[in-house]
Curated annotation (Swiss-Prot):
Disulfide bonds: none annotated. It comes from the Bacteria. This is UPF0312 protein Shewana3_1179. Belongs to the UPF0312 family. Type 1 subfamily. The lineage of its organism: Bacteria, Pseudomonadati, Pseudomonadota, Gammaproteobacteria, Alteromonadales. Gene3D superfamilies: Lipid/polyisoprenoid-binding, YceI-like.
Amino acid sequence: MKKQLLAALIGGSLLAPMAASAADYVIDREGAHASITFKVSHLGYSYVVGRFNDFSGDFSYDAKNPTAAKVNVKVNTLSVDSNHAERDKHIRSGDFLNTAKFAEATFVSTSVEDKGNGDMVITGNFTLNGVTKPLAIQAHAVGEGQDPWGGYRAGFTGTTTFAMKDYGIKMDLGPASANVELDLVVEGVRK
């Protein structure tokens, strides 16, 4: 009995630091240290580039155990900004984002694959235009550490591509413009 109790205490004390080492972060939107940008081919000749100005989210991350990471992001699709007011109005319409009906896009991670050297694949459920489908983000841990204000930060980049038709966007701009590339820059402040 004493041996079992001792083994349980030792085992528990060894596992406790591992369980406590994952940290929760909130995406730093106030300091403008995060961005969600997109790029779509314009007829195969150039690109339309834009961003979402309003989004929020949080994540849990432990550099020693990246596969346990969790990510949750909400994007206000009304905040789309392609640097052209008339185009933004069209992007918000039923032809594309249908923001009158679906004013929010979300990403909730379901798994993280550690690729080594800070690289990972974050897979999750992406909801856009009322459609939810799995989406994989190629991500990289940029770094983490103390900031000058007494907080602790962790930063990441990510990229992914999806087909508009997969999310019920039926506007046909031709094959060169069928996909959207998303680029993500995320800096989180430890809660």
